[in-house]
Amino acid sequence: PDNQAIIIVGDVDVNHIENKIKELFSGIKVPANAAKIEPVEVADNDTAIYVIDKDKEQQYDIFNIFMKHPAIPNAMKGDMSYLMKGYMDNVVTSMLGARYAEIAQEADCPFLQAGADDGDFLLSSTKGAFSLIGVAKPGKVKEAYAAVLCEAKRMHDFGFTATEYQRAMEEFLSQVEKTLANKDKMKNEQFTTQYVD
């Protein structure tokens, strides 16, 4: 019980809900021999680790590439540097996503779509990952993989143009304004997700 939490969002009677939680859960005690909960460190690796699998229900060839990095410590979450990192991650993945969308318009592009993200490494709390995802055209998995990775390498080596940044920043600000304008229409699960993260 000491490694669990209850998150309640919505228009509720705080005193009533707090008393109900205490009534239901205050009697639960931590067992004397409870296992110690410790985060499991995810090791770094010098060479690629890959898995290839098939799913007869999956119509497309999809690939994910994870580039691990240290996770953001919980103590830093909520401060200004964390918010700035979130902004930078959003803008970088948006700019790279725009490049992938533009490339996908070319007739000889080997992928149907591609994108990038930066967040948790699978279920790990000790590692984050910059990740790329691609959906290959039929029979073009190797070419699609190479094209997606090549554009990410180009981003790493040469960065972005001022025009790309301006467009991404304007999109970000537009999203923020839209969220603010609709703040009274946010669903409870949106708040819950933010609290869990």
Regions found by a protein language model. Give the residues of each.
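M16 family metallopeptidases and their MPP-like homologs
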Residues: 2-9, 59-80, 100-197
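An aromatic/glycine/proline-enriched structural segment found at the starts
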Residues: 5-63, 170, 174-180
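Long, highly charged amphipathic alpha-helices
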Residues: 16-23, 91, 95, 143-150
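Short C-terminal domain-edge/linker segments immediately following a structured domain
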Residues: 36-42, 82, 94-99, 162-167
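Long, His/Glu/Asp-enriched segments that create or flank divalent metal/ion-associated functional microenvironments
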Residues: 63, 85, 89-93
